[in-house]
Amino acid sequence: MSAMLTEQDQGKGVAMEHLPNKVSGKHELAVDAYFSADVETDGPIPGPFSILSFGLVYAGTFDGRHFERPQDYDKTFYREVKPISEDYQLEALRVNGLDRDRLLREGQNPKSAMTEASHWIRDVAGFAKPVLVAYPLSFDWAWLYWYFIRFSADGSPFNHSLCFDIKTAFAVKASIPIAEAAKSKLPPSLRPQSRHTHHALEDAVEQAEIFANIFQWEKKTHGRTP
């Protein structure tokens, strides 16, 4: 069913038992709760084109000193969404393999999909601040922020700027230009166990693994002079 409600996205505070006390409200310091996101679309920009599916996975917390990655990436949210316009690009459909005609019939209404996603994010984050992470951030953020503002009854759970670009983090830690910070340039120690499949949820999990690997990466040597 396209509007799939998984066991992982049912109920309030589904990940609270896996979060540090700071996230559950037992600590007054600000805490980030990270959510890796991936979208599959039928074109390059929201509005004229549509989100066809999106996936979210809880990706860890950070209190300014300690990063805690999940033991398992099993706190997830996935929806397939009804297109909002008649425009699409065949190349985009070839990449993600989604049946746009089926989604016109069976896809979830974007208003309910985005409102449910916002509720799930806020429930998992608890008292922490939800932060969207992606590699690169620009594409997924542009789509999800537009869709949350346009369709969610609660607006954006990430406000207008609570976001983290994994590509920039890698470039800074590796002391390389952004142009050289593609996923293909990741050293073996930072690569994920999951494969990139162009399924939104699977790619969000893959991305969450990369995010945690880079966040915890202590670079000892590098060929460049800072």
Could you say what each language-model-derived stretch is?
Residues M1-M4:
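Methionine residue identity
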Residues K12-S138:
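Conserved non-catalytic scaffold segment of RNase H-like nuclease domains
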Residues D38-E40, D140, D165, D203:
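Acidic active-site catalytic centers that drive phospho-/nucleotidyl reactions
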Residues P44-P46, A171, E209:
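Conserved protein kinase catalytic core
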Residues Y78-N96, R100-L103, F164-V205:
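Active-site-proximal helix-loop-helix substrate-binding element of RNase H-like nuclease domains
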Residues V131-S138, A142-W143, A182-P226:
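Acidic, Mg2+-coordinating catalytic module of metal-dependent nucleases/exonucleases
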Residues S138-S161:
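Substrate-recognition/cap helix-loop segment adjacent to the acidic, metal-dependent catalytic center
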